[in-house]
Amino acid sequence: LLAAALVAQAHGAEPVAPGSAAATWLEKVRLAAEGLEWSDDAVKHEWRLQQRPGSDAWRILDPADACVTTGDEAACRAEFARLEAAGQIPPVTGDAVIVLHGLGENRASMQPLVKHLRSRLDATVLTFGYASPRANIDDHGAALGRVVASLPQATRISFVGHSLGNLVVRRWMHLAPAPDLTRVHRMVMLGAPNQGSDLARMAARVWVLAALSHGAAKDLVLNWPEISRSLAVPACEFGIVAGGKGDGRGYSTLLEGDDDAVVRVAETKLDGARDFLLVPVSHAAMMKNSSVQEATVSFLETGRFGGAAAPAPDAPPDE
């Protein structure tokens, strides 16, 4: 769609007026496309040092998501450090919460939840963007580790993940040095495929879909048995929010049992969870759901979701 709009302009179409609805839409499309291409390497408030995975293309984004510097890794790291030393990029101190999106999404998909968290928590709420189609879960976990390492003055760090974002956090936890892990406070998992994904297993049986899988999607579709062994169970307090109807059937006719249209309730299970909550919401709508938003705040503050929490499923799904 973005390409079509640009081609139309190049062939004499009426230019898009700045600030118009069309310009706003084009900007959203551009940011969505870039979210599939660039991964954060350092995040300080809304300043970002980013890399295009698999290349030596680096850049710095300011709080308006405008690109202020491009170049190789050394040049961009040096400029980011200069901006920090000059006080343009302030340090993150005290409590921090890092929010992660899911597969094929970008930071914008988490904004409804992020906005709510920022209005309610006495913490710096950051978003971690990663190019899910361009790199595997190992690479995304390593990138998250560099983001955490870039926050040395954050005394406690909590995580909120949606879908694949939870697996990225768990992969980082498997790799993380002890000093970083000691700063981890709590984690909220939203629609997490902790036991893999039946939808991914279905895709693996269709050779065309399997062949088209790239990056983190390939890990879910083809490499799950291996990947699952490299994901840590969080040592911190963590709670799980699952979407479902509570009727044993769920939103999808393709999936067995209750589900959120993408992830089965049973697939969200992970031993050691401090609390579990079933919410009547689809996978893609979790971030906008007021019950999910309030439960997330409650867990980050108290270690419990509050209200009536459903019992966790007794067993993970069959492989």
Model-derived regions, located:
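Short amphipathic alpha-helical segments
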Residues: 110-112, 171-173, 201-202, 252-254
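Flexible, membrane-associating and regulatory peripheral segments of lipid-active enzymes
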Residues: 6-97, 106-111, 115-126, 148-150, ...
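C-terminal catalytic-base region of ester-bond hydrolases, centering on the histidine
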Residues: 19-23, 233-319
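Residues that form or flank phosphate/diphosphate-binding pockets in enzymes
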Residues: 108, 135, 287
